């Protein structure tokens, strides 16, 4: 064994330090020669021996042994038993690990062992350290909290499942260890002053075990412990019972978890009778009874993901993850295990080399191909171990430093780096050729853009990767926030029971969704809204399939959610509406104004009239469907704001009619009908709409302000089996109407209904006789109630009642009034409202309540109607502000320029409120917005109500 000249100075320095320490005096010459050789190659060996005098003294004796793995557990157990606290135990563990790793590295660098011997020692050492640390900590925890037991009082162990290379007995030199913790049965501890649940006991035990192995101390650490392969990953419980574990893998187990579980092995399994139960439980999840060709596509996607990560991180010369590297050999073996392992017991091996032998025996690959794979695997794994043993670092990337390159080449038996590099390339080329033949390369089938969206979903556990894709590949401004949203969404989904079918659909759907979302410049708004909706429907696979199978529906979903949080929330709350997205032509084409009543009757006709609950749900669904179509047309610019309000108002009127009809049937079935209706048409009942519904100005979230009227005389009774007073009948009818509107079903409420504008307000009769209504309006109503009457119209009722209401309204509005008194009362009421509702945000203009806003315009219109209708009776005709101003012009009351300014201000501010409603924003704007319009409104107010102070 000799070193090339560039490495000699490094070795000489190490030898000088060793001689000064004096420990070489007791070493045989052959060992000193080996140490000099290794000193030029491994910083780890030199530094560990130099730091540990006991190791330096005992190393000759250790190296004289051909194998030490059989005694690992007994020797470590003895040392841990002598430890009475964690600090001492942690020191023992780290010293034990470092000493044995020096022994293994020495054997590797001197080529005393085969690869199999080296991997076996590394794996046995890790298992011994994990298991004996567990045994030590279990005893300490039992002393502190009692022994965990099941319902029969039997002590319960924690089983530690080693995953990946640890489970397969193929651990590399500086590897992480992937673990899953489980225990057989729930129960509680016994033998301590206070019992705790088994789950709590094992969680604390697991935390201590991880700390004992993973924590960095003065003596270093033992292993980096990775628990992310457990059910639900980092968001899941640290430890799960068998039952919970089984439920998870049956209901939610994903393809990559199947691959990971192939190599799963319980640490110290011969100690546990419970091991067989766990093994039998997991086998059906890993190995399917049928031949499962879906594994190929899944592995191909995983490989594509890894290749993307290699590119992104700039991992050139990576012998594990690069093309033809160790991971591709593992994937080749796993393909056959997953496809045929359910039928071929020989393929259920954990070790890769024995699996490749089984593949050869079963003639699943050509013998020459298997030979290439075996040779490459042994070569690359030995190279990986030596690379890591040089400095005890977890790396699979070949060095770019010339001295390190030479050291690695010498360790592998070469005199030059180039020769090693040539052999590495040849081995990896042969592996990749087999891989492409067998599995193919998804990257050839997928465009770079599509790959980004696949990776966004596949890598949604890695913030760094996701943020890089969003920022570099998709040019997103808010990459950090959006990355967090995607990662949190996937973590939350991991806790849901999706089932294999649901998860498969979701995995197909998500890249398509990302593609649609990030095609929009406002993706930062669309992303959280769409993810929120998907979170709500994730367990309902039919909805996921609808979006997956109908690209048009998916496109419309993203478009609408991006444009409006109101729509996204509605879809999230009532996913039945997703059906409406399938046909864009229908979606953006609302029902004709005069067809709402007919469409609603047809919609309800499919439901039995006596099924009250279904009828109520159907009303709500009809409203939601129509509102969605109106909003979609609104967002698309098909409908101007005035037309949007028309549609929402006509929809509300159709629903009011249907609700009255349903309520009438339900009340009449019980009591019969009032007898005064026998010789006439209709129901003798009316619904008067006030405010927005009265003025044809409904918004998406508007309440219905209504007053109920009837014309039933006194001393009239119903004709049913259970006779009641006629006026009592109408009271029950109104109560039933409000119930149908307000009851919260699975589809929500229909409308919020406000009846406080009735005579005498909340203390008055819920249903008012029309003659009492007339008397109240003439004799008892306040001026503000007459203002409200300006915007009142009958939205449901008999012709007789309609003409009566119109007569009363006209007479009341056209009453002669004293102008100064009217001015004062209107202005005073406005001032009260402004004090109560306006100016809540000093840095914002409240569109409705602040000075110069919508309410000022409405009050102006109402004042002018009340003041001038006595001499200009045509002013009472309309209930909406726009047509009131048109009539004021026509009747010569107001100059056209002023009326047009007020109309423009009114419609502009309404438009802004409406737009902000779609965005779920408050009805306020910056102080510098609409300044000219607001000043014009204030000037008009001063002109018409000049005797009042505002």
UniProtKB/Swiss-Prot annotation:
Function recorded in the entry: Involved in the regulation of glutamine synthetase GlnA, a key enzyme in the process to assimilate ammonia. When cellular nitrogen levels are high, the C-terminal adenylyl transferase (AT) inactivates GlnA by covalent transfer of an adenylyl group from ATP to specific tyrosine residue of GlnA, thus reducing its activity. Conversely, when nitrogen levels are low, the N-terminal adenylyl removase (AR) activates GlnA by removing the adenylyl group by phosphorolysis, increasing its activity.
Keyword Magnesium: yes
One Gene Ontology MF term: [glutamate-ammonia-ligase] adenylyltransferase activity
Any one GO cellular component localisation term in the record: cytosol
Pfam families reported for this sequence: GlnD_UR_UTase, GlnE
GO biological process, alphabetically ordered: regulation of glutamine family amino acid metabolic process
Protein name in the entry: Bifunctional glutamine synthetase adenylyltransferase/adenylyl-removing enzyme
Residues spanning the signal sequence: none
Start and end residues of each stretch annotated as Adenylyl removase: 1-443
UniProt family annotation: Belongs to the GlnE family.
Cofactor section: Mg(2+)
EC numbers, comma separated: 2.7.7.89, 2.7.7.42
UniProt region (Adenylyl transferase), positions on chain: 450-950
Reactions accelerated catalytically: [glutamine synthetase]-O(4)-(5'-adenylyl)-L-tyrosine + phosphate = [glutamine synthetase]-L-tyrosine + ADP; [glutamine synthetase]-L-tyrosine + ATP = [glutamine synthetase]-O(4)-(5'-adenylyl)-L-tyrosine + diphosphate
Ranges that cross the membrane: none
Keyword terms, alphabetized: ATP-binding, Magnesium, Multifunctional enzyme, Nucleotide-binding, Nucleotidyltransferase, Transferase
């Amino acid at each position: 064994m000799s070193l090339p000249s560039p490495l000699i100075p490094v070795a000489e320095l190490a030898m000088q330090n060793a001689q000064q320490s004096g420990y070489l005096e007791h070493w045989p010459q052959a060992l000193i020669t080996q140490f000099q050789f290794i000193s030029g190659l491994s910083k780890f060996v030199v530094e560990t021996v130099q730091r540990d005098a006991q190791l330096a003294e005992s190393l000759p004796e250790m190296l004289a042994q051909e194998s030490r793995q059989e005694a690992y557990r007994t020797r470590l157990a003895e040392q841990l038993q002598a430890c009475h606290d964690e600090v001492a135990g942690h020191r023992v563990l780290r010293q034990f690990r470092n000493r044995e790793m020096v022994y293994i590295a020495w054997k590797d660098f001197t080529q005393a062992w085969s690869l199999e011997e080296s991997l076996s020692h590394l794996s046995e050492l890790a298992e011994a350290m994990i298991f004996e640390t567990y045994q030590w900590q279990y005893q300490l925890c039992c002393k502190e909290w009692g022994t965990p037991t099941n319902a029969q009082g039997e002590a319960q162990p924690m089983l530690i499942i080693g995953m990946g290379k640890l489970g397969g007995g193929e651990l590399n030199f500086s590897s992480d260890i992937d673990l899953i913790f489980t225990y057989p049965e729930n129960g509680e501890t016994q033998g301590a002053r206070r019992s705790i649940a088994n789950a709590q006991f094992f969680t604390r035990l697991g935390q201590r075990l991880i700390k004992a192995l993973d924590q960095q101390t003065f003596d270093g650490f033992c292993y980096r412990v990775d628990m992310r392969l457990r059910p639900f990953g980092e968001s899941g419980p640290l430890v799960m019972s068998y039952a919970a574990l089984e439920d998870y893998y049956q209901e939610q187990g994903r393809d990559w978890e199947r691959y990971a579980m192939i190599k799963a092995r319980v640490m110290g399994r011969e100690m546990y009778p419970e091991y067989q139960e766990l093994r039998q439980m997991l086998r059906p999840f890993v190995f399917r009874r049928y031949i499962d060709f879906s594994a190929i596509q899944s592995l191909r996607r995983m490989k594509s993901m890894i290749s993307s990560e290699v590119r992104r991180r700039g991992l050139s010369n990576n012998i594990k993850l690069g093309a033809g590297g160790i991971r591709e050999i593992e994937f080749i073996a796993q393909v056959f295990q997953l496809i045929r392992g359910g039928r071929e017991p020989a393929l259920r091996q954990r070790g890769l080399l024995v699996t490749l032998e089984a593949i050869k025996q079963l003639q699943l690959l050509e013998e020459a191909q298997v030979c290439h794979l075996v040779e490459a695997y042994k070569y690359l794994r030995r190279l990986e171990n030596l690379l890591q043993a040089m400095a005890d670092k977890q790396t699979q990337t070949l060095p770019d430093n010339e001295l390190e390159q030479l050291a690695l080449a010498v360790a592998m038996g070469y005199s030059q780096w180039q020769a090693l590099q040539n052999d590495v390339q040849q081995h990896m080329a042969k592996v990749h050729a087999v891989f492409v033949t067998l599995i193919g390369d998804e990257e050839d089938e997928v465009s770079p853009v599509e790959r980004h969206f696949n990776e966004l979903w596949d890598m949604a556990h890695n913030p760094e990767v996701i943020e890089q894709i969003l920022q570099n590949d998709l040019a997103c401004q808010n990459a950090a926030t959006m990355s967090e949203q995607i990662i949190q969404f996937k973590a939350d989904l991991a806790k849901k029971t999706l089932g294999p079918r649901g998860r498969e659909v979701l995995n197909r759907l998500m890249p398509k969704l990302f593609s649609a979302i990030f095609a929009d410049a406002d993706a930062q708004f669309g992303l959280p809204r769409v993810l929120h909706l998907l979170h709500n429907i994730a367990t309902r696979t039919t909805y996921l399939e609808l979006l997956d199978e109908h690209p048009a529906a998916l496109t419309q979903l993203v478009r609408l959610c991006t444009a409006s949080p109101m729509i996204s929330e509605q879809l999230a709350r009532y996913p039945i509406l997703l059906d409406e997205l399938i046909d864009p032509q229908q979606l953006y084409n609302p029902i004709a104004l005069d067809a709402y009543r007919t469409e609603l009757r047809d919609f309800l006709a499919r439901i039995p009239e006596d099924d009250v609950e279904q009828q109520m749900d159907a009303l709500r669904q009809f409203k939601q469907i129509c509102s969605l179509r109106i909003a979609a047309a609104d967002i698309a610019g098909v409908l101007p704001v005035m037309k949007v309000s028309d549609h929402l108002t006509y929809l509300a009127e159709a629903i009011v009619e249907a609700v009255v009809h349903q309520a009438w049937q339900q009340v009449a079935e019980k009591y019969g009908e009032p007898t005064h209706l026998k010789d006439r048409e209709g129901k003798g009942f009316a619904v008067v709409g006030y405010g927005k519904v009265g003025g044809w100005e409904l918004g998406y979230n508007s309440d219905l302000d209504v007053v109920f009227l009837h014309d039933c005389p006194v001393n009239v009774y119903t004709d049913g089996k259970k006779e009641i007073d006629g006026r009592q009948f109408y009271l029950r009818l109104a109560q039933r109407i409000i119930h149908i509107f307000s009851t919260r079903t699975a589809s929500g409420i229909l409308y919020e209904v406000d009846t406080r504008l009735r005579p005498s307000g909340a203390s008055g009769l819920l249903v008012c006789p029309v003659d009492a209504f007339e008397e109240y309006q003439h004799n008892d109503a306040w001026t503000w109630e007459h203002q409200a009457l300006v915007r009142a119209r009958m939205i449901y009722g008999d012709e007789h009642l309609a003409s009566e209401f119109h007569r009363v309204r006209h007479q009341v509005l056209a009453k002669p009034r004293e102008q100064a008194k009217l001015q004062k009362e209107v202005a005073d009421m406005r001032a009260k409202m402004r004090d109560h509702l306006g100016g809540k945000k000093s840095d914002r203009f409240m569109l409705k309540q602040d000075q110069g806003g919508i309410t000022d315009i409405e009050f102006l219109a109402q004042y002018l109607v009340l003041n001038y209708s006595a001499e200009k009776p045509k002013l009472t005709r309309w209930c909406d502000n726009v047509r009131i101003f048109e009539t004021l012009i026509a009747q010569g009351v107001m100059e056209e320029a002023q009326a047009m300014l007020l109309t423009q201000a009114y419609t502009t501010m309404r438009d802004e409120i409406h737009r902000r409603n779609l965005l779920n924003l408050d009805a306020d704007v910056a102080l510098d917005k609409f300044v000219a319009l607001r000043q014009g409104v204030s000037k008009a107010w001063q002109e018409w109500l000049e005797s009042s102070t505002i």
